[in-house]
Amino acid sequence: WIMGHMVNAIAQIDEFVNLGANSIETDVSFDKNANPEYTYHGIPCDCGRTCTKSEKFNDFLQGLQKATTPGDSKYQEKLVLVVFDLKSSSLYDNQASDAGKKLAKSLLQNYWKNGNNGGRAYIVLSIPNLAHYKLITGFKETLKTEGHPELMEKVGYDFSGNDDIDQVAKAYKKAGVTGHVWQSDGITNCLPRGLDRVKQAVANRDSSNGFINKVYYWTVDKRSTTRGALDAGVDGVMTNYPDVIADVLSESAYKSKFRIATYEDNPWETFKN
């Protein structure tokens, strides 16, 4: 999965997919009542990027729905996975459940069109704080009470705080999550970061009793960093330059080992050689 980083304006969806992304990451900011409000990152952000592009969250969802619905004039067949980077650190811990409920309602109405031919992309809820695990339970409960528990088949999870892997496992246990787990590791492109924790995550993914299904590394803009991540065995890389990643994937060392994921590839299944 080539994951376009910080795609917060509707116009950027086409821009990143046309450069080779089959996945995008979108920032979600919340108001003080835990309503998802804008697709917005803010300052500071990655080096070489504008930090302040934004849309109202529900408007973005409607644009995203068009981009991921076959037959729509804006349909982008290659776009199969969306990571919502939930900026829930602005909330109190006891608001996490409400944030999950309100997020589910927004997606149900504006993206899934209440289960009536909505967008088809798989969705990852990426949460920065292990203490906010109730965001997941609130989200799940809401889809159930609204009569669409089947949509949870399209939803996966990530804790993005670079926490100790054992602590991440505990948070999922509390949230009742068994599967659909992506594990991120990374840092802003302005700073270097080693691959030690990525390798730990990959080892968990590949062990018989691991809880991780997929591992991605962020934010990868250089060819050398891309090669390091691929050599470590990641499933995805998040990038400001999808064309750079696509380029490296076409090198002889990688093109026999990796291919770009399509809609037929289940993002919740651990890849077995």
From Swiss-Prot:
Q: Does the keyword Cell membrane apply?
A: no
- Enzyme class per UniProt: lyase
On cofactor binding, the record's note says: Binds 1 Mg(2+) ion per subunit.
Name any cofactors this protein relies on.
Mg(2+)
Write out the catalysed reaction: an N-(acyl)-sphingosylphosphocholine = an N-(acyl)-sphingosyl-1,3-cyclic phosphate + choline; an N-(acyl)-sphingosylphosphoethanolamine = an N-(acyl)-sphingosyl-1,3-cyclic phosphate + ethanolamine; a 1-acyl-sn-glycero-3-phosphocholine = a 1-acyl-sn-glycero-2,3-cyclic phosphate + choline; a 1-acyl-sn-glycero-3-phosphoethanolamine = a 1-acyl-sn-glycero-2,3-cyclic phosphate + ethanolamine
- Residues recorded as binding Mg(2+), renumbered to this chain, are 25, 27, 85
Would I find Lyase among this entry's keywords?
yes
EC number assigned by the record: 4.6.1.-
UniProt entry keywords in alphabetical sequence: Cytolysis, Dermonecrotic toxin, Disulfide bond, Hemolysis, Lipid degradation, Lipid metabolism, Lyase, Magnesium, Metal-binding, Secreted, Toxin
Q: Which GO terms describe its biological process?
A: killing of cells of another organism; lipid catabolic process
Disulfide bond residue pairs: 45-51, 47-190
Q: What one GO molecular function would you report for this record?
A: metal ion binding
Q: What does this protein do?
A: Dermonecrotic toxins cleave the phosphodiester linkage between the phosphate and headgroup of certain phospholipids (sphingolipid and lysolipid substrates), forming an alcohol (often choline) and a cyclic phosphate. This toxin acts on sphingomyelin (SM). It may also act on ceramide phosphoethanolamine (CPE), lysophosphatidylcholine (LPC) and lysophosphatidylethanolamine (LPE), but not on lysophosphatidylserine (LPS), and lysophosphatidylglycerol (LPG). It acts by transphosphatidylation, releasing exclusively cyclic phosphate products as second products.
- Annotated family: Belongs to the arthropod phospholipase D family. Class II subfamily.
What protein am I looking at? Dermonecrotic toxin LdSicTox-alphaIB3b
Query: What organism is the protein native to?
Result: Loxosceles deserta (Desert recluse spider)
